[in-house]
Amino acid sequence: MSGGASRKPGGTVEHLLHPCNFYGGGAFFIPETGISPKLKGEIFMVNIDDGITAMEVAKSLGMGLYKAACVCRIDGEVKDLRTPINKDCKLEILTFDDDDGKRALRHTASHVLAQAVKRLYPEAKLAIGPAIDNGFYYDFDVDVPFTPEVLEKIEAEMKKIVKEALPLERYELDPDEAIAMMEKKGEPYKVELIKEHAGKGEKISFFRQGEFDELCAGPHVPDTSRVKAFKLTSCTGAYWRGDSDNKMLQRIYGTAFTKKEDLDNYLHMLEEAKKRDHRKLGKELGLFTIMDEGPGFPFFLPNGMVLRNTLIDYWREVHKRYGYVEISTPM
């Protein structure tokens, strides 16, 4: 949903022009205007009070859009739905179908993961947890390994947090206050990140959900209940900030969707891809092996040589058919 607006003195916004992106489908009715927009991109006008949030705008357009909304875009900048509208602007309500909506929901899922880990393992130290292509991850400094059994335990706690529908509330602190808070919580990695930004003269932003406070610029979905379908997919080691001189952390990967059906389809796709993984097939079929002396270089086994020579013979036949001749250069 996007448009332009002009404000009256006294704090109202009138003539808000909205070409709507109804990603969720269906029609919505706006009582105060008598408008029932049905097509993506349809333009209509509404009046809203000065200071109303983007979430309230979405709700006024229909519960379908409100429930599907993840974040908004105000004059091209992605913001939380709790952001008040206090100026003439172009406003878009973004759902999971939008890339920015996906990133926001999956970023929120990483916060849910971190909160679950802190509930189960209070001694865990938090590093970073961004959204990435097709999912999210979070890095933890912990003494216990995150085994598959532990991941199942964490997932169960995440489901509890989602069910609690905890609102994500943004707030800001002065750098000194932010450092003091994270030091009190025993979060050295967060303190390091805050100190790097402290010299910019800007306040430090956090998001709070229940008892959990996270250093973060956002944006996020309104509450944890929006993370309806998720799965922790793997765990691996990762050096803090990608530097081998730093401590090795444990990175948990996951993905999240708004619908269980979409999650199931994605996980099925991953399983099918695993079946066709050349590393898996190479080992199972005895085609090649990888040795420590030559990482990344396949050493062909007898079965692999049969396949390799068959391909080379076919390559020679095709090239000969089209008039090519072979040459050889020094290796």
Question: Residue spans of the language-model regions?
Answer:
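Ubiquitin-like/PB1-type beta-grasp interaction modules and other compact soluble beta-rich domains
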Residues: F29, I35-S110, A114-N134, K153-K160
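Intrinsic disorder/low-complexity segments enriched in small, polar and charged residues
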Residues: G11, I30-P31
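Auxiliary tRNA-acceptor-end handling modules of aminoacyl-tRNA synthetases
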Residues: T83-A104, K125-G129, Y137-M331
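Cationic, low-complexity basic patches in intrinsically disordered or flexible, solvent-exposed regions
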Residues: P9, H15, L39
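Targeting/processing segments of secretory and organellar proteins
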Residues: G4, G24-A27, G41
